[in-house]
Structure formats: C-alpha cells, structure tokens
Amino acid sequence: MIIIPAVDIRQGNSVRLKQGNIDAETIYSKDPVFIAKLWKSKGAKRLHVVDLDGAFSGTNINKAIIKNICAAVDIPVEVGGGIRNMDKIKEVFDIGAAYAILGTVAFNNPEIVKKAITRYGSEKIIVAVDAKDGKVAISGWKDITPIEASELVNKLKEIGVQEILYTDISRDGMFTGPDFAGLKKLSESGMRIIASGGVKTIDNLVKLKKYEKDGVFAAIVGSALYTDDFKLEDAIEEIEGIKC
C-alpha cells in the first residue's frame, strides 16, 4: 500500500478544508509547488492534487500551478477537481498529470467516463466516489444524492472502471479515522481502491494496510501531514516494513 499526500489548491494557495467546507479553510502555504516538492523529498511516490476552485465552480483557475507541480516532481501526479468533459480530461493529461480523477461527471454522464477509458485506458482514469452516510455526494460535495455508494461502484464497474477513490466526506479533515466498514463493502466490487478521509495516525494506516488484500492499494493523507500529527517518512517506513 502506498501513501499519497494530498495537495489541495484554492485561489492559488495550498489549503485544507473540513468536510469540504470552504468556511472551514486553513491556508498552509501560498506556494503549492513548494508543498509538492516537499512531499516528494519526504519519500512520496505519488501525489494527489485537487483544484478546489474547479470542484466547486468548474473553473480551473489553478491550471498553471498544477502544470508546474507536474513538471517539478518526477513522480506520478493524479489530478482532480472540475474535470467534467473530454476537453478538460485532455487538458489534465496535456499539463503532465499521470491520472485524471473524475467525480461528478461519472454520476451525471457516465458515457464520458466510458469515452475517457477508451481513449486513455482504464489505468489512467480514476473515479472519485464521495459519500456521506453511504450516499453519493457530487458537485464539490455540495449535493447529496439518494444513490448508495456501492450501487454507483457496481455501475462504474460495468462501464470498465477499474480504480476508484473513496472518500467518506464526514471524516475528511476531521481526524476520526477511515471508514473501514465502507471500504470493506466497496471492496466486494473487486475494484482497486484508494482510501481517503479521516487518517490521523500511523496506526490508522497500519489498519488500512490489512485491507490491501481486498483491493485497497493506496491511502491519501492530508490534514494529518499538514498539522504534523505524524511524519510522512515515518509512515512510509512503517507501512513498507509490514509484510502481508
């Protein structure tokens, strides 16, 4: 299992939100490229970059910053936030991203996901499944749908999706621990899963590592790294030392 540091960008700054709430924003740096290089220097093998302006409004005003991040680090970068049509997907790859994360569009227009998989390959397309109380959330987590996350995942599998990013938004930035029950349920799909939301301790990651056999191959860590709850390099050393 790999640990993927999160770099969330809003209005040009590296920020963290709580439960996706803009009013609960903390700015950690005015230089997201520096932050990306920092996590790379601490041993990150992949980065998770989200354009929050894109997620909330659909306008990708941070494109130049994300392009600079991709150029500044020699590790794969997955990029999400407001990617809702084929032009935006192409744009993400053109600026150097290794993976495109699709969220709202996968719910509203799954045909675009199918087209993206056909054009770029299923290994390049990640679908974000964001949920609150088990229900799918879309449009920057502002709208909660009546659809169960597990139902959406099964539909995604039918159209060729192989990798999902699962976030329990009630845990995001709240340090309450990952949604192990939700991950276990989604793992029944046979998908490759990136776990996100709630990680506070290295022990949380050690427990997530036990789900590797169920398809959880990566964990995104955000707030805990920025508040220095633990060191990225310590977490990587601990997780890599565990033999499953």
Swiss-Prot record:
Domain of life, source organism: Bacteria
Q: Quick one: where is this thing mainly located?
A: cytoplasm
Enzyme Commission code = 5.3.1.16
User: Which positions are catalytic residues?
Assistant: 8 (proton acceptor), 130 (proton donor)
From the UniProt annotation, give the residues forming the signal peptide: none
GO MF assignments: 1-(5-phosphoribosyl)-5-[(5-phosphoribosylamino)methylideneamino]imidazole-4-carboxamide isomerase activity
Pfam families documented for this protein:
His_biosynth
Q: Where in the cell is it found?
A: Cytoplasm
Instruction: Please give the positions of the paired cysteines in each disulfide bond.
Output: none
Annotated pathway, please?
Amino-acid biosynthesis; L-histidine biosynthesis; L-histidine from 5-phospho-alpha-D-ribose 1-diphosphate: step 4/9
* Catalytic activity field: 1-(5-phospho-beta-D-ribosyl)-5-[(5-phospho-beta-D-ribosylamino)methylideneamino]imidazole-4-carboxamide = 5-[(5-phospho-1-deoxy-D-ribulos-1-ylimino)methylamino]-1-(5-phospho-beta-D-ribosyl)imidazole-4-carboxamide
Q: What is one GO cellular-component annotation here? A: cytoplasm
Presence of the UniProt keyword Transmembrane helix in the record: no
- Keyword annotations of the record: Amino-acid biosynthesis, Cytoplasm, Histidine biosynthesis, Isomerase
Q: Which HAMAP family match?
A: HisA
**NCBIfam families, alphabetically?**
1-(5-phosphoribosyl)-5-[(5-phosphoribosylamino)methylideneamino]imidazole-4-carboxamide isomerase
Q: Which family does the similarity line name?
A: Belongs to the HisA/HisF family.
What is the protein name stated in its UniProt record?
A: 1-(5-phosphoribosyl)-5-[(5-phosphoribosylamino)methylideneamino] imidazole-4-carboxamide isomerase
**Species name:** Endomicrobium trichonymphae
* Gene from which the chain derives: hisA
